[in-house]
UniProtKB/Swiss-Prot annotation:
Belongs to the pyrimidine 5'-nucleotidase family. Specifically hydrolyzes 7-methylguanosine monophosphate (m(7)GMP) to 7-methylguanosine and inorganic phosphate. Also able to mediate hydrolysis of diphosphate (m(7)GDP) to 7-methylguanosine and 2 inorganic phosphate with lower activity. The specific activity for m(7)GMP may protect cells against undesired salvage of m(7)GMP and its incorporation into nucleic acids. Also has weak activity for CMP. UMP and purine nucleotides are poor substrates. Changing G76N: Decreases KM 6-fold for m(7)GMP. Decreases KM 1.5-fold for m(7)GMP and increases KM 1.5-fold for CMP. The gene is cN-IIIB. This is 7-methylguanosine phosphate-specific 5'-nucleotidase.
């Protein structure tokens, strides 16, 4: 049965003004009425129609820590491994300092950025070839940064597991690092799937990354094989929360049916004023320097509250 626009949550239509997490100064919206509409659709649809699609670097992890310490990217964790060749870090640093400014440049069109991202990932793959590597080193480095997940991330992932909501972690970074951090932080639950760039080996030596290459501007659900187990799990779930920290992340749900209801949440930290308009035009909710999972958790709590009311209603009517 399709969504009935006239239906409302059992307790009445939810209003943004009654949801404290969404009325704070750092929580910006281009179209509050649209956000309110989507929230009500999510709440009516319940957890069985939900899925989450999230970036990893600086989305699940913080963009800054309270003590000012740096949070490495998933590739940064790999680059910190001691057994890498001496020139490896220097060469990857050169690539980072060349291409990262392009990735976050608020003035360059995305179509132009794509070619640079392909260059970056291709050159990174070429550097990551021809030497032995023990993957347990990634675990050793990753263990130091499990504290760098956004505040209340553990609770957020526990909520998702409890509600049976499939969660796709989509990363243009290094999947081996992503999996290691999530596993050691005890949030890699059975409902969580990681799609990313994973190391591959040939004859005991590193041989770049497995295909397909996933960069900032091509990661979306169209890369999920229609015969895959995860595709079977989510292709009927048409209520989607998308979370990311870069403009390209907003397209991670591309490939889902046009009838889907999608809430896009953007975490903005770099070049706030210069990026604000683009983020506001791209995301439904823009969170400025918010290092928590409070807003997505709030959405889940609203969905769960209505779900419980729905479960209780038949019991009450039978009394």
């Amino acid at each position: 049965m399709g969504f009935d626009e006239k239906r409302e949550p059992t307790g009445g239509r939810l209003r943004l003004q009654d949801i404290p997490a969404l009325t704070q100064d750092h929580c910006r919206m281009r179209d509050p009425a649209e956000v309110e509409r989507i929230i009500n659709e999510f709440v009516i649809g319940g957890p069985e129609r939900m899925q989450i699609v999230s970036d990893f670097d600086y989305t699940i992890t913080k963009q800054r820590t309270e003590d000012g310490g740096a949070v490495p990217s998933s590739f940064g964790i790999f680059n910190a491994c001691q057994s890498l060749p001496e020139n490896f870090k220097a060469e990857t640093d050169k690539l980072y300092h060349k291409y990262r400014p392009i990735e976050i440049d608020p003035h360059m069109p995305i179509a132009e950025k794509v070619q640079y991202m392909i260059e970056w990932w291709t050159k990174s793959g070429e550097l990551t070839s021809g030497f032995p590597f023990d993957q347990s080193e990634i675990d050793q480095i990753a263990s130091k940064y499990t504290h760098a997940l956004r505040d209340r991330t553990h609770e957020f992932f526990a909520d998702l597991q409890r509600l049976g909501i499939p969660t796709l972690v989509f990363s243009a970074g290094l999947g081996n690092s992503v999996v290691s951090v999530l596993r050691q932080a005890n949030v890699l639950h059975p409902n969580v799937k990681v799609v990313s760039n994973f190391l591959q080996f040939r004859d005991g030596l590193l041989d770049g990354f497995q295909q397909p290459m996933i960069h900032t501007f091509n990661k979306n659900e169209t890369v999920l094989n229609e015969t895959s187990e995860y595709y079977d799990l989510v292709h009927t779930r048409d209520h989607i929360i998308v979370m990311g920290d870069s403009i390209g992340d907003a397209d991670m749900a591309s490939g889902v049916p046009a009838s889907s209801h999608i809430m896009k949440i953007g975490f903005l930290f770099d070049h706030v004023e210069a990026n604000m308009k683009k983020y506001m035009d791209t995301f439904d909710i823009v969170l400025v320097d918010d290092q928590t999972m409070d807003v997505p958790r709030t959405l889940l709590s609203l969905i769960e509250k209505q779900h419980k009311l729905n479960l209780e209603a038949p019991k009450q009517s039978s009394l």
